[in-house]
C-alpha cells in the first residue's frame, strides 16, 4: 500500500520505518524534509494531535510551518486519512469530499497504551527534578483515570508513599484494593503541604493559587493534563514554584513503542475496510 505521512513528531518518523519494514511504500512530508505539495498517496497519515492552535498542522520537525489549508489541498485525491484529535470542522470537510476519516482517539487501546509512556515519562521528570530520591518520598496523584491508575501503581512499586485524590467512591475502593491511600477533594488542602511531588492528571483547575500557596518549598508539580492544564501557572511562576506542564510525553520518551501502537491500529483499520 502507498502511504503519505505528513507532520507529527518522532512517532511518525518511526512509523514510516515500520511501514516500510512491512512492505509498504511510504513518502513523508513536514518531517524534516523540504515541503513538497506535489506528493500524493491514497492513504494519508497525519499527526497526533492534528493541530495545537487550530491554524497550523502539528509538525514540530518541519523545516517550514504547514497551514491546515495546505493539508486539505494535499489530501484532495486521497481515499483515507488517519490522524489524532482531528478538529470537527476539518473532519466534516474531509468526509464531504468522500474521504474516509479515522481518528486515533476513537480507539481506546491507543489511549490505554499511551498511559504507560506518559506515566514513565512523568516519573522520569520527577527523578530528574527532585532533590531527593523518589524512594521514600511522598507523592500526590490527582485523578484516578487511565493515567492516574497506571502512574499511582508504578509509584507504589518504587516505594513512593503515594496518595490519590479522587471523587468517586468506586475509585476510593479501587485505591484501597490496590494498596493505595486516597483522599477526597475536600481533603486536598490539609494534605497538600506533606507532598514532595504532585502529579496532576485532571483536566480541570484543581491547583489554584490558594492550593499552590500551601505546598512545600521544594515540592515539584508535574501537570499531565491537556492544555490549559490544571494549575495556576502564572501564580506558580510568581511564587517560584517548580511547575512542569508535561505534554505529549509518549512521543518524547518512547517514540518506537508509540509508533508500533499506531501501526497496529492502522493495520486494524485497513483490514476492517478491505
Kindly label every feature range from the protein language model.
Residues 22-35, 158-178:
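NAD(P)-binding Rossmann-fold cofactor-contacting core
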Residues 49, 66-75, 175-250:
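Rossmann-like adenosine-cofactor binding region
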Amino acid at each position: 500500500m502507498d502511504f503519505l505521512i505528513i507532520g507529527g513528531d518522532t512517532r511518525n518518523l518511526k512509523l514510516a520505518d515500520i511501514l516500510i519494514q512491512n512492505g509498504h511504500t511510504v513518502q513523508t512530508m513536514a518531517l524534516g524534509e523540504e515541503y513538497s505539495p506535489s506528493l500524493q498517496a491514497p492513504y494519508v497519515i497525519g499527526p497526533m494531535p492534528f493541530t495545537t492552535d487550530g491554524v497550523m498542522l502539528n509538525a514540530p520537525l518541519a523545516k517550514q510551518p504547514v497551514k491546515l489549508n495546505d493539508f486539505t489541498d494535499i489530501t484532495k485525491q486521497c481515499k483515507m486519512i488517519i490522524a489524532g484529535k482531528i478538529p470537527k470542522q476539518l473532519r466534516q470537510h474531509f468526509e464531504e469530499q468522500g474521504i474516509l476519516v479515522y481518528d486515533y482517539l476513537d480507539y481506546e487501546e491507543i489511549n490505554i497504551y499511551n498511559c504507560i509512556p506518559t506515566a514513565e515519562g512523568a516519573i522520569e521528570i520527577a527523578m530528574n527534578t527532585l532533590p531527593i530520591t523518589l524512594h521514600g518520598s511522598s507523592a500526590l496523584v490527582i485523578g484516578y483515570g487511565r493515567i492516574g491508575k497506571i502512574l499511582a501503581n508504578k509509584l507504589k512499586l518504587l516505594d513512593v508513599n503515594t496518595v490519590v485524590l479522587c471523587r468517586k467512591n468506586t475509585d476510593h475502593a479501587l485505591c484501597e484494593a490496590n494498596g493505595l491511600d486516597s483522599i477526597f477533594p475536600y481533603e486536598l488542602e490539609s494534605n497538600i503541604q506533606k507532598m514532595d511531588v504532585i502529579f496532576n492528571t485532571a483536566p480541570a483547575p484543581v491547583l489554584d493559587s490558594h492550593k499552590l500557596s500551601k505546598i512545600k518549598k521544594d515540592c515539584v508539580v508535574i501537570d499531565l493534563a491537556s492544555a490549559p492544564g490544571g494549575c495556576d501557572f502564572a501564580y506558580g511562576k510568581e511564587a517560584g514554584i517548580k511547575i512542569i506542564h508535561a505534554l505529549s510525553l509518549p512521543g518524547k520518551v518512547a517514540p518506537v513503542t508509540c509508533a508500533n501502537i499506531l501501526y497496529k491500529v492502522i493495520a486494524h483499520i485497513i483490514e476492517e475496510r478491505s
